[in-house]
Regions:
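Hydrophobic alpha-helical bundle architecture
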Residues: 318-336, 351, 355-363
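Core structural elements
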Residues: 89-94, 221, 336-340
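Glycine-rich phosphate-binding loops at beta-strand->alpha-helix junctions
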Residues: 171, 271-273, 328-349
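Extended, folded domain segments that form the structural surfaces/walls around functional sites
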Residues: 21, 184, 205-206, 218, ...
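Glycine-rich phosphate-binding/hydrolytic loop that grips phosphoryl groups
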Residues: 357, 361-405
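Glycine-rich phosphate-binding loop of actin/hexokinase-like ATP-binding domains
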Residues: 212-254
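Nucleotide/phosphate-binding catalytic cleft detector across ATP-hydrolyzing
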Residues: 1-26, 30-215, 233-234, 244, ...
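Residue-level signature of catalytic and energy-coupling elements of molecular machines
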Residues: 20, 29, 87, 183, ...
């Protein structure tokens, strides 16, 4: 057992794990088989999603249908039946706080048991959570037994007094309820509710990047999530409800063409950095109300795209400047479907005046940032250890259940 990522209690697993990412543009499912900690993706599903707006569920039935379509695709490819999933939770209105608890060890022998770990986690959660919020996760970071600090797993040790130090994440009840409702209505159980930026920062960055501090910007279809990890902890998240769909809408409005045409133009000819494009390269655009296609040059399309991408990135810069995040040495990592746009790294480097790189998953058939979240949900869920699971059942409403997920 090793502790990767300061605080997130991880261990290598064997078994089957399923990740579910309910995005604004699409719902992604990944089935992964772990053999002694080695991950092998055996099934993928990706279904168009119409039930979300700006990252939030607005139509439960449509979201349920998209989940079922994505699950069916993954089941067919993997040749298994999916009964339960690990589902990503967006960072909207997420709050992060440190917590600590202290107890007297209960058994007469003074040997620390699972029950003591659960009790000390309960003591750390004695706080008033506002009625509209609920605890999403508690992550034990270390324990102190009779003054001995830095213990990662105190079970089996002897002690009279035990303390736990950790981090607690809370989120809005409405968002959590709607996600649970959609998954359950789709006929699936939930193993882990995983905070997506927590899984993402934990699994796509190196130990050094997590330790010294790095910014991760996840550019989705409906929203952009900016996260900061430092000292191996997710310290900050911010959600801007603008994403790749807004770029498509801008193209549609400016060029007076349908949303589907605009999406095709963005994918086939789009570039976020006009300096890299040519005003002489032209392509035909079907314009509403005109019988003949209109010729549009690459540079003009790029300027439309640049305006929106710049606005999205500048909003991230504003919130990051407030917390001096650009002083962290890890620079900026971009990911998410909208980040696959050519030229986006150049533009981001110009805006942030920092080192920027694009993260692309390194799995065959999934080498697209659109799959970064769903893969990280699987990896994160598979690596959670016993201490995490014991502490989790200190959260009101959590019932003890196995970690595996098929």
């Amino acid at each position: 057992l090793e502790l990767i990522g300061g605080g997130i209690p991880f261990m290598a697993k064997t078994g089957m794990y399923v990740g579910l990412d309910i995005g604004t543009t699409s719902v992604k499912v990944v089935v992964a088989e772990y053999i002694e900690g080695q991950m092998n993706i055996i099934g993928v599903g990706n279904a168009k999603s119409d039930g979300l707006n700006r990252g939030i569920v607005v139509d439960i039935d449509q979201t349920v249908q998209a989940i079922q379509r994505a699950v069916r695709q993954a089941e067919e490819k993997a040749g298994i039946q999916i009964k339960s999933v690990n589902v990503g939770l967006p960072a909207n209105l997420l709050e992060v706080e440190s917590c600590q608890g202290m107890i007297a060890v209960s058994s007469e022998s003074k040997e620390i048991t699972d029950e003591d770990v659960r009790n000390v986690a309960s003591a750390a959660l004695v706080r008033s959570t506002p009625p509209e919020r609920q605890i999403v996760a508690i992550l034990p970071q270390d324990f102190t037994v009779d003054g001995f600090e830095g213990i990662k797993d105190p079970r089996g040790m002897l002690g009279v007094r035990m303390e736990m130090f950790g981090v607690v994440y809370t989120g809005p009840k409405t968002i959590i309820h709607n996600i649970r409702k959609c998954v359950e209505k789709a006929g699936l159980g939930i193993n882990e509710l995983v905070i997506t930026p927590l899984a993402l920062t934990e699994t796509i960055l190196t130990d050094g990047e997590k330790d010294f501090g790095t910014i991760v910007i996840d550019m989705g279809g409906g929203q952009t999530t900016t996260s900061v990890i430092h000292d191996k902890q997710l310290k900050f998240t911010h959600v801007n409800q603008e994403g790749g769909e807004f770029i498509t809408k801008d193209i549609s409005i400016v060029l007076n063409t349908s949303f589907n045409n605009a999406e095709a133009l963005k994918i086939n000819y789009g570039d976020a950095y006009p300096e890299r494009t040519s005003a002489n390269e032209e392509f035909p655009v079907d314009v509403i109300g005109k019988s003949e296609p209109v010729r549009v040059d690459e540079r003009y399309l790029s300027e439309i795209i640049e305006a929106r991408v710049e606005q999205i990135l500048r909003k991230s810069k504003e919130v990051l400047d407030e917390i001096d995040a650009f002083e962290l040495p890890g620079g900026v990592v971009l990911t998410g479907g909208a980040a696959s746009m050519p030229g986006i790294v150049d533009l981001a480097q110009e805006i942030f005046e920092a080192n920027v790189k694009l993260y692309v998953p390194n799995h065959m058939g999934l080498r697209n940032p659109v799959f970064a979240n769903v893969i990280s949900i699987v990896e994160y869920s598979a690596q959670l250890n016993d201490i995490y699971h014991i502490a989790k059942y200190a959260i009101p409403g959590e019932k003890s259940k196995p970690a595996q997920s098929v």
